[in-house]
Amino acid sequence: MYKVVVQLSSNDILVQKATISQLNNILNAFESIEVEVVMNGLGIDLILTESLYHHTLERLHEKGIQFLVCKNTLNHRNLGNTSILPFASIVPSAIAHFIIRQHEGWSYIKAGF
């Protein structure tokens, strides 16, 4: 099975749209794939409770995509766990998560253009 971890660190609306498109393309290209989207820095804006893409992200989650948020970023921005959409999970450190996943053989993609 293929495994990919995607980093989103931008809150640019065009990058967010491109990321959603890329996620759909990944799902359409592979019958069996594990996908994690890890958001850190300004990228967490996509998964905040007031996100314009709430329903789109929820549908992607229902198709198996995991959305992970950096706890360090939440702390830095003084946001609590309830600030993110309920289907998202929290990782202690996005950077550490990327290192772990790459060590485990996961592919890494920087979201956007």
Sequence positions of predicted segments:
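Loop/turn elements at helix/coil->beta-strand transitions in domains of secreted/extracellular proteins
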Residues: M1-K3, I33-E34
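Secretory/periplasmic and organellar redox-cofactor proteins
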Residues: Y2-V4, D12, N25-I26
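Short glycine-rich or small-residue beta-strand-to-loop segments that form or flank ligand, phosphate
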Residues: K3-S9, V38-N40
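Short, glycine-rich nucleotide/cofactor-binding loops
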Residues: Q7-K17, D45-L48
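Solvent-exposed loop/turn segments at secondary-structure junctions
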Residues: N11-D12, G43, T73-H76
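Histidine-anchored nucleotide/phosphate-binding helix
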Residues: V15-F30
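Short internal beta-strands
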Residues: V35-N40, F67-K71
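A cross-taxonomic marker for long C-terminal extensions/tails that follow the last structured domain
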Residues: L52-F113
